[in-house]
């Protein structure tokens, strides 16, 4: 298949190609079926290759009589398998309009074990079905006919009136009729006493639990687990997972067999082996069983007065086609069970939860297939359980596919970024001469750049002469397009395709200019296919005419011998993106310099906007937290409470000022200490837990009411560098609900007074009986959903109350429906279930999001008699607070990116300045010039150190390494004296104690220089014009080193009140007593932490007319000092 196009929507192009392929394949299927019916046992299976080739290419197939007859045969076949019988009823009269020939014998035959009373009922056209079943059975069937989606009740247990034999009735609707399959309940079976899916779910509980416990990231492990579980659940000799590829051919990707059986793992087979019509039926009926391929089929007799032929497509008894039976016999498979794996179509877009049709487009990903070497019957309840298991498997497959697509797209974006970088350095040859190159952009065997009449080749490619011939062919036959992609140059019409051999079959080409092009090549598909099945023995001869897995594999290789793997849409998107990049590069190749001034101006604007936005968001968030109607508290990294809003203060009776500073573990009940300790530990590691329940103590007048029960979500608070600096807990008070549940568990059966109570503390509650019928629906649920109690009682909870199409409360998608079934089933089997997210559309159309808590309902003997479901709703304030929090995080991330960019851009000119300084050191300079150069070098070193400080937490926590050197303070005097504009603008002199400055010391001189400069700047800003700044040093020696006192005085202050100097709030920030530190406050905090790393500390002293920073550090004396001593 080839595609010649300048650009296309990926989803639309894929969908249109897929539709065309289905139509073409259906025509092939029809021709093969007709050939088989005509040839019978002499059918040559290898003809599938010839038929495929005759319809191949891009020519649209014609809809002829053969195709029409084939589709009619598929849909209107009148044969069933003999393991059961079939009746079709008129919905209005309950009279039979069609029946299988074996129905009278199975349903009306007299049993000698049951005494006969009166005449035996006769079954035929026009018979009232209520006359051949017992009264309860007839009533159950009559009730089923009144259901909108009657399949929700399957299977219905019925008993024949004459024989008393039990049957499972499996009901489905077709146009104007109700079709019922009757399957006998085997003597060894324990018949299900109730209808509905919930009972069947129990059979697959273990398998579902195992699937859900698997970590994501491995499709192979997921398939292996599914196949193993199905193998154990069904008891067949072989279980396999089939995957359909993009071109509709299939592959066995996982397999489990009994010992001694020939493996089929790795087998590929042509698309014709599973016809498109069969795939369509698998989309409708998710499970298909063949009990015995040798069994004689039973005819279905239809009322001649019916104006149309009945379709049996939805029947569980529908007979398989003769060609499929022949295939099964040849592979020694007598019985089979097939489950469809239906996933979301990844090409579908535009679906939203609020759209009129919330269902996404679906596609058949593959099949889970079981084979048996002897006849095997699986009861309908177990088949239903397998269907549900396949639905859960499909959800996980869908998630793995989404994860794979994200990884692929991420890798493509990364490679594109690297290619862009190469183009900036060496355009355009960098994409073929450096690594990574264009072969890393998409999966291929070779790539070529055709640029300025020269050729650069990578990997396996055609020769230069062949490449020129391909380029000429493209310009001759595809001159109007900017590119071509095909999985078969032969099918695309390239005359020299056969001469290229197996090495080059598929090609993607894009035109950059009228003369320059890029090519990617792929070898034939067969080169990448390796069958993992039984090896071919030298003496064994294959008969390609027989329908058999080995023949399928051989036929598949024949079909794909001139084809490569198809080019996926995301790969073509990546190729077209590179094409556009190259075009722009060629246009701007002489003007590649970027206007950095514009970028810096934009970043500056972004920084200002980000600050204003962050401040606004922060103020709003603080207001919301304080006024929220849900309890919110926060702790720092030590577990000490630093946030306690009004609501939690009201609930606990503990005032804010009393709570601040207390350890969280001292405020919770002893029974909850371990839970909170674990949650706090994980949150500080960045692992945020959801829906954690614990009890917190009450105080004062509230202590008499007992502890408060909270369900909280832990949210790690992070700084600009994504380091965790605390934990915020957003809670929901469920004390009232817990009291209800505690009381419920203590009451023996009489719970109506609680459930139907209109007290606003009672949460929304609904429940089911053991058979899945809705048995409870309290007033809170009525208020929430808009559906009254009498409107939902005695409806199937799964399907009628909560479902997809005509349900009262419509769910978002199939995945939500399956997940609800899993949760209910888990509770029904007696297992403890966790709270899960749940959402549905209320009667008004509003989408309700909540938490669902499911509890089993027990009788006096402890047996499960149903489930109770409690809903917890998030308040409007909480939702708004979370929204504001997300905005805050996004703003912080934007600022962090801008900061990272600025730091990177500063490094380049700084390196240039350092280099220039080193070059000047080799020139003849005067003493004053040398001093200035030395000062400049020290300032550059300080700036370099600061740029390397990417992790401020390591400084704050004391994990920074100091670089120890000998120095004198005099050397660094110029650094902090001349580096402040305020000194010159205000005319403030800095007086130094020159004598003490000459002392030789040993320590981290650059960090000490940073500290001095920071504290000087802080004082200079707040010192009025004409003031004075004094820096003095004094020493006294100890055996372990020297202690340095530096006093920074601000004299002649013109402030009229005592205590003049820096604001008290800034001092608090320096000591870490104010969590909302400003930029100046953060700078002082870092400087103080650096001093503490030098075994010192900082004090701030206010005196009359002046104030001082007193900095003490412990430094060793240098060699000169030691000599003097």
Curated annotation (Swiss-Prot):
The protein, known as: Phytochrome A
Assembly information from the UniProt record: Homodimer.
Source organism (scientific name): Populus tremuloides (Quaking aspen)
Lineage: Eukaryota, Viridiplantae, Streptophyta, Embryophyta, Tracheophyta
Domain GAF: 218-401
Superkingdom of source: Eukaryota
One GO-annotated biological process of the protein: detection of visible light
Similarity section: Belongs to the phytochrome family.
Processing after translation: Contains one covalently linked phytochromobilin chromophore.
Function: Regulatory photoreceptor which exists in two forms that are reversibly interconvertible by light: the Pr form that absorbs maximally in the red region of the spectrum and the Pfr form that absorbs maximally in the far-red region. Photoconversion of Pr to Pfr induces an array of morphogenic responses, whereas reconversion of Pfr to Pr cancels the induction of those responses. Pfr controls the expression of a number of nuclear genes including those encoding the small subunit of ribulose-bisphosphate carboxylase, chlorophyll A/B binding protein, protochlorophyllide reductase, rRNA, etc.
Domain PAS: 617-687, 750-821
Residues binding phytochromobilin: 323
Record field: compositional bias (Low complexity): 1-14, 39-48
Name of encoding gene: PHYA
Any Pfam family the entry gives: GAF
Coiled coil: none
InterPro entries xref list: GAF (IPR003018), GAF-like_dom_sf (IPR029016), HATPase_C_sf (IPR036890), His_kinase_dom (IPR005467), PAS (IPR000014), PAS-like_dom_sf (IPR035965), PAS_2 (IPR013654), PAS_fold (IPR013767)
